[in-house]
């Protein structure tokens, strides 16, 4: 059975599952399109070119848009856990099953289908994102038996705090911005919730109790200490730490009281990208295990709708998948030989260049699904100097308070971090050992968001890390996404060359070829 699913709205994507295996998950923002792009015709054509047949099932994820005088619905709509609709339709001349289920269900089934198989009689799913904030009990037949509502819009509330402090965010008519949550997560590390005074605490509690964040009610907070205070102000940093703490406490208390103890927890929705919260869920002790998919936000929604369809027709949501299920790199041009030389990749020599302070644009295989660069579309650099962090943020044209993540081979985890658990998708924080000297990748609170690498998971990166370890003692590098500011991952040679030449990067690796900027 071949299933093709479409995700409307922001973070547009298409996904294809064939015989219970993820074939492709293609986000329209990738290949240097604007972040959060709606589904593009080119994305659909990219998938159609690579599939050998017309699908048996066409699945449309639900969505809704807030218009000036009404709500416009696509497919099954945004909210709800009602049973999907299945009808017969035609698709390019072939009779197909047409399937549609809500956006809320796409998050639930994305988590269920990507999680490891578990024979527990019940499972718990948490969906927390821009609009939905609820737990779900799943029975042994993969059916939703209970929904426990916690809070509407946890992600929107979190993002709103950033907009409240940001003088550039409109006072009326705005919506919480999709990219603000990650920035607030970075700022929260600079603050301490214990420093919150009565004014800051009052604002945070107001945000938690606000009826709706659409449109963002910034004007109602004109009298608050946080109104246009500046996102790097002490007040904003303290409030960010407090809101981070209070949101988690609210959901954790419901989990302890309402959700089956000892069940596995599967986390879905954009809040699943918050490494602080993921770490706290893992430490809670109420659940037997915690799973977060690399595409836990809306980048995995098309895949979730496809899995929902698979479950409807087969009774089993589980799929075989790889995080590297995007498109292969496109060689649409060759670097100008007058400006670039090429040579076969030698890992030992490249690690020497990295140890000497060079920044390397690193491209391998198919792009990663989800928003995190997992060493197939990455900028790499040595991890020891704070100046390296500043240089990478300058290259990426982003705020200097943003941390740089490390990639570490599993053999070195215990040497440089206090916790040595594996995290191949970069979804949890851990504490950096002060003796490691990893200043470029240590955030202000002593934490790091680490991608761990095994030889079996990413052999090219593991080999490079091993070569770097032979020279510098540990297999750790800076690893940040290879993209123009405000765009998805770079995926073609013309964009890669433009990026490197415009940002002073002299080394590019594509597959087994190392390109170096010619001197002179």
Swiss-Prot record:
Keywords recorded for this protein, A-Z: Antibiotic biosynthesis, Transferase
**A Gene Ontology biological process term:** antibiotic biosynthetic process
Which CDD domains does the protein's record reference? Answer: ASKHA_NBD_CmcH_N
The cross-references to Gene3D superfamilies, in alphabetical order and at most eight, read: 3.30.420.40, Carbamoyltransferase, C-terminal domain
The kind of enzyme this is, by top-level EC class, is transferase
Name by which UniProt lists this protein: 3'-hydroxymethylcephem-O-carbamoyltransferase
Q: Which organism is it from?
A: Amycolatopsis lactamdurans
Write out the similarity annotation. Belongs to the NodU/CmcH family.
The question of whether Transferase is a record keyword is answered with yes
Pathway assigned to this chain's UniProt record: Antibiotic biosynthesis; cephamycin C biosynthesis
Give its E.C. classification number. 2.1.3.-
Q: Which PANTHER family match?
A: NODULATION PROTEIN U
Functional description taken from the UniProt entry: Catalyzes the carbamoylation reaction in the cephamycin biosynthesis.
Which GO molecular function terms does the record list? transferase activity
């Amino acid at each position: 059975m071949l299933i093709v699913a479409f995700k409307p709205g922001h973070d547009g994507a298409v996904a294809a599952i064939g015989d219970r295996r993820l074939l492709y998950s293609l986000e329209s923002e990738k290949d240097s399109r604007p972040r959060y792009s709606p589904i593009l015709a080119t994305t659909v054509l990219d998938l159609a070119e690579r599939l050998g047949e017309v699908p048996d099932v066409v699945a449309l994820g639900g969505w809704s848009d807030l218009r000036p005088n009404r709500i416009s619905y696509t497919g099954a709509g945004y909210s709800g856990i009602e049973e999907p609709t299945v009808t017969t339709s035609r698709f390019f001349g072939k009779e197909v099953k047409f399937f549609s289920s809500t956006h809320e269900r796409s998050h639930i089934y994305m988590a269920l289908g990507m999680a490891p198989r578990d024979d527990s009689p019940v499972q718990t799913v948490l969906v927390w994102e821009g609009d939905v904030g609820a737990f779900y009990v799943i029975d042994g037949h993969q059916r939703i038996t209970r929904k426990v509502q916690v809070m509407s819009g946890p992600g929107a509330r979190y993002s709103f705090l950033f907009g409240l402090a940001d003088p550039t965010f409109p006072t009326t008519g705005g919506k919480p911005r999709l990219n603000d949550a990650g920035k607030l997560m970075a700022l929260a590390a600079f603050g301490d919730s214990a420093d919150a005074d009565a004014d800051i605490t009052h604002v945070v509690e107001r945000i938690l109790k606000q009826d709706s964040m659409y449109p963002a009610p910034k004007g109602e907070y004109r009298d608050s200490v946080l109104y246009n205070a500046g996102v790097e102000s002490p007040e904003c940093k303290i409030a960010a730490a407090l809101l981070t703490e209070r949101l988690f406490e609210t959901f954790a208390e419901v989990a302890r009281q309402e959700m089956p103890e000892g069940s596995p927890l599967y986390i879905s929705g954009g809040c699943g990208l918050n490494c602080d919260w993921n770490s706290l869920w893992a430490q809670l002790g109420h659940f037997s295990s915690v799973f977060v998919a690399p595409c836990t936000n809306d980048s995995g929604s098309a895949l979730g709708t496809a899995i929902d369809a698979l479950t409807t027709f087969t009774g089993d949501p589980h799929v075989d998948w790889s995080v590297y299920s995007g498109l292969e790199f496109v060689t649409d041009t060759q670097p100008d030989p007058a400006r670039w030389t090429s040579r076969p990749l030698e890992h030992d020599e490249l690690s020497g260049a990295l140890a000497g302070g060079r920044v390397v644009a690193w491209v391998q295989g198919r792009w990663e699904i989800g928003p995190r660069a997992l060493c197939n579309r990455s900028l790499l650099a040595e991890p020891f100097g704070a100046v390296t962090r500043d240089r990478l943020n300058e290259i990426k044209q982003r705020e200097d308070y943003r941390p740089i993540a490390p990639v570490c081979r599993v053999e070195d985890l215990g040497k440089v971090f206090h916790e040595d658990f594996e995290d191949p998708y970069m979804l949890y924080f851990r504490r950096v050992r002060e003796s490691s000297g990893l200043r470029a990748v240590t955030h202000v609170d002593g934490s790091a968001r680490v991608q761990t690498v095994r030889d079996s998971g990413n052999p090219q990166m593991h080999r490079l890390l091993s070569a770097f370890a032979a020279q510098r003692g540990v297999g750790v590098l800076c690893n940040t996404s290879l993209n123009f500011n405000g765009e998805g991952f770079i995926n073609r040679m013309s964009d890669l060359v433009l990026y490197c030449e415009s940002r002073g990067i002299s080394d590019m690796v594509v597959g087994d070829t190392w390109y170096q900027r010619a001197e002179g």
